[in-house]
């Protein structure tokens, strides 16, 4: 990864962060589905980075999200968990022959089906953790499941839409 790629990653991180805190922070579709588009940056962190580097980046990025959401570490906890299990999810989804390069994870490098499944798994786990922690003390199974499923679907759709609109470096896949 060269300096230009790192600068592009930083610009995308900042853009996604702005979209999250300015648009989606107070927006809930039908009062149920929230959108955690910031996960798009986290699940696209390069595989070339060591896990510890990704954990540090995720920690500071989601800590900023928690500050704006006024949620004391809930998003950070969930995001650190998914970045920690991400290598296992990738091993689970990698075909027998492997991939040419796992340096960049996007719809254009991995294919839409693979990326959608990958994002669904990680976003579902993240939203499950977030809403489980938030609902401690006032647990309602039906409401919680509705929030988890609808937020997962909305977030994955938004992440894919963001990639198609703003990530224009397409591969041959």
Task: Give the location of each predicted region.
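Terminal, non-globular segments
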Residues: 1-173
């Amino acid at each position: 990864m060269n300096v230009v790629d790192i600068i592009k990653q930083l610009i995308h991180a900042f853009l996604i962060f702005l979209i999250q805190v300015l648009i989606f922070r107070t927006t809930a579709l039908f009062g149920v589905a929230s959108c955690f588009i910031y996960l798009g940056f986290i699940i696209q962190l390069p595989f070339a980075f060591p896990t510890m580097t990704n954990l540090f980046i995720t920690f500071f990025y989601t800590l900023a999200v928690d500050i704006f959401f006024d949620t004391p570490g809930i998003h950070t906890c969930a995001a650190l968990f998914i970045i920690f299990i991400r290598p296992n999810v990738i091993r689970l989804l990698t075909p027998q022959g492997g991939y040419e390069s796992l340096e960049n994870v996007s719809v254009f490098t991995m294919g839409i089906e693979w990326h959608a499944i990958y994002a669904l798994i990680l976003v579902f786990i993240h939203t499950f953790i977030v809403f489980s922690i938030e609902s401690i003390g006032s647990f309602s199974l039906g409401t919680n499941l509705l929030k988890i499923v609808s937020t997962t679907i909305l977030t994955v759709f938004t992440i894919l839409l963001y990639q198609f609109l703003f990530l224009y470096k397409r591969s041959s896949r």
